[in-house]
Amino acid sequence: MKFNVTLAKGIYMKRIFLIGSAFIGIIVGAGFASGQEILQYFTSFGTLGILAGIVSTVLFAYVGMMLVWLGSIFKAEGHNDVIHKLTGGTMFGKVIAWLVDIVLIIALFGFGVVMLAGGGSNFEQQFGIPAVYGTALMVILVLVFGMLRVDNVVKVIGNITPLLIICIVIVAIYCLFTMSGSFSELDTLAKSHTSAVPHWFIAGVNYVSLNVGLGASMSIVMGGNEKNSKIAAWGGLVGGIVLGLMIMISHLAIFSKIETVGHLPLPMLGLVNDISPILGVFMSIVIYLMIFNTCLGMFYSLATRFTEIETKQFKIFYTIFTLIGFAISFAGFTDLMTFFYPVIGYMGIIIIIVLIYAPFKVRRIKKQGKSLQDL
């Protein structure tokens, strides 16, 4: 009997770990890997970036827990299922669903454009090749593989995420142990860089709502596949906490070398190059593949929002969205991130408000003796 209890706990822990890892994989993308997100949202506030990181950690923990938990208790297949059941199909619910849909559409396009520009910045920073060539190659790859629907390629590249996380942690530890200069000196240098938003607290909130805008639907679907809502909730909670810790580790790494990498479009790549140019080339390729993976996912999802997959209309929409993104990408990776990310983040607060309201609504539904699945 004791063995069975231990075995059950082991199985539960494994499922919690898998859900947590999947949540991290949904949120962590090429923007995080580049380090530019961390620089603008956290490091640019100097030592106060730690406080912003704590705010993000708390919010990511709550948001991760709620998204996966809601998916589980409602057996949801998408975010609209949850919104419909929470609002009872009222006009208010339809308005909220429409607003969330708008947020997701803008987020998909905005992220796609920023990532196209990021592909060019990657080439320029690492190899000295003009950014336009790196971006043009990215556009060609996105168009070709998007038309072929080579899912296996995307899955393989998606598996790079755990390796990337390990690399970031190792790089961060190295940077902290080799840090030169006092915290006060580094703080002054860090604060001289452009911030995405005006205050560290807003940065912590905006960064979470920015990422939730893209990760909400997938996280809910993931929760819908977990029968045990407690395991789902713990998995989302653990994933959110680990994600927050990764943010703070990355922030401290960039902060410790701000004089060396603060001016670079991809600070994390600069940190790796500082350790070894050979590792820098490897990291550059990994980031480029992650950018490709993100771009493909963004424009593919955007096109499927308006058309059916594998139709002539899909190919037309997909091509048009990608080419428009290519044209806008000439504004530059850093400038585009500074513009698009805060806007998407402010809009994404709508989703966080829904998640704060959700547990109270669920409790009320249960008190009325209604089945959550039959709503």
PLM-predicted stretches and their roles:
Residues 14-33, 52, 104-108, 112, ...:
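Hydrophobic, membrane-embedded alpha-helices of multi-pass small-molecule transporters
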Residues 52-53, 85-100, 161-176, 239-249, ...:
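Small-residue-rich segments of transmembrane alpha-helices in multi-pass membrane proteins
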Residues 30, 105, 131, 142, ...:
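Hydrophobic alpha-helical segments and their helix-loop junctions in multi-pass secondary transporters
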Residues 55-81, 249, 253-257:
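Juxtamembrane transmembrane-helix boundary signature
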Residues 118-121, 130-138, 145-176, 337-355:
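Membrane-interface loop-to-helix entry segments
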Residues 192-193, 254-277:
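Membrane-interface interhelical connector segments
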